[in-house]
């Protein structure tokens, strides 16, 4: 029986998911947890996935379809949270798949232990080949008892295999609303900041090592695109912004929770992503611009000041040396060029 105390609202941002969306929806309507509402936010789709969404909304009373002009997954998720009527909310990507007992497992955990968040493991799958592997190996992270949100976040980050993805859990809606936790419009990998802030506010969290979600990778996945030139520069700006936002969260919550070393060091890890992208960038001018932004944005300082271990400190110092070396080389090149052409 569905009531306000056991209801789950599943939020799906929909943008041109094609026929994969049908598989996603079939996995949701066959869930063993029946106290469920499914909220599809059509984010300006132009393909047949809109017709698929209409079919399910017309034929299943617990499926709702809302429309908005294309504004991105963050805006769609925020809107879904606003209209959700469940005690808990969950998020699904429109081209993924949910295993039949996912929400029964997580909601049972949440209700029995009065959790703010229940999270699970997931399988990652290449859509083209079918190759599948578990996201978090059990030798790195096992099922837990009830923890505080910060303690669970610390444990997950320490495993180095836990990922900031919102689709591996159910979240108490009141925690989101009370603390005004929003997905940031236009920010790629917005899950990183959102999950961090949610865990900072969660009093009771629990994790199961069961894989209950199937995340599909394909050639056009955002995380797998090989970017070069301006596309790479613009993409790395998102990670630079994430380092700033994470540092701001640590600062804002320092008087409310223990800011563990892992919360600092995740900033360094995100900064190192940008450094690796600089190294792989083939276009010299773009690389120079990326290096300049690392310094002017303050990311260079965040890379160094948030180190909390010898191993990561060594990596950060190595990259610090490289960045200064590259920047000095660029400046020397500019000076020589200007001198050769008698420029002032």
Curated annotation (Swiss-Prot):
Any GO BP annotation: cellular response to phosphate starvation
Protein's recorded name: Uncharacterized glycosyltransferase YibD
Gene Ontology MF: a single term: glucuronosyltransferase activity
Tagged with keyword Metal-binding: no
SS bond partners: none
Annotated EC: 2.4.-.-
TM ranges: none
Source organism superkingdom: Bacteria
GO cellular component annotations of the record: membrane
Record-stated family: Belongs to the glycosyltransferase 2 family.
Matching NCBIfam families: PRK10073.1
Enzyme class of the recorded protein, top EC level: transferase
InterPro entries referenced in this protein's UniProt entry, alphabetically: Glyco_trans_2-like, Nucleotide-diphossugar_trans
């Amino acid at each position: 029986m569905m009531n306000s105390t056991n209801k789950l609202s599943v939020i799906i941002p929909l943008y041109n998911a094609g026929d994969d969306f049908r598989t996603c929806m079939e996995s949701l309507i066959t869930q063993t947890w029946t106290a469920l509402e499914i909220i599809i936010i059509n984010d300006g789709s132009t393909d047949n996935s809109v017709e698929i969404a209409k079919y399910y909304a017309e034929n299943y009373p617990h499926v709702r379809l809302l429309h908005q002009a294309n504004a991105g997954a963050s805006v769609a998720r925020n809107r879904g949270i606003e209209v959700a009527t469940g005690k808990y909310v969950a998020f699904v990507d429109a081209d993924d798949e949910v295993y039949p007992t996912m929400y029964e497992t997580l909601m049972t955990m949440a209700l029995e232990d009065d959790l703010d968040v229940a999270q699970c493991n997931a399988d990652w799958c290449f859509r083209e080949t079918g190759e599948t592997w578990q996201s978090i190996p059990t030798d790195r992270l096992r099922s837990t008892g009830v923890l505080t949100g910060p303690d669970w976040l610390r444990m997950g980050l320490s495993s180095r295999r836990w990922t900031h993805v919102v689709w591996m859990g159910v979240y108490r809606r009141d925690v989101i609303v009370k603390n005004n936790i929003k997905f940031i419009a236009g920010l790629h990998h917005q899950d990183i900041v959102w999950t961090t802030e949610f865990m900072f506010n969660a009093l009771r969290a629990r994790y199961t090592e069961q894989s209950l979600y199937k995340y599909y990778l394909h050639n056009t996945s955002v995380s797998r695109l090989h970017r070069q030139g301006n596309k790479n520069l613009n993409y790395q700006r998102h990670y630079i912004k994430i380092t700033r936002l994470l540092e701001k969260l640590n600062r804002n919550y320092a008087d409310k929770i223990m800011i563990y070393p892992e919360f600092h060091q995740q900033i360094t890890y995100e900064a190192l992503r940008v450094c690796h992208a600089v190294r792989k960038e083939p276009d010299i001018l773009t690389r120079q611009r990326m290096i300049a932004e690392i310094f002017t944005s303050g990311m260079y300082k965040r890379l160094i000041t948030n180190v909390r271990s010898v191993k990561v400190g060594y990596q950060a110092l190595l990259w610090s040396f490289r960045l200064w070396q590259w920047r000095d080389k660029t400046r020397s090149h500019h000076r020589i060029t200007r001198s050769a052409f008698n420029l002032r």
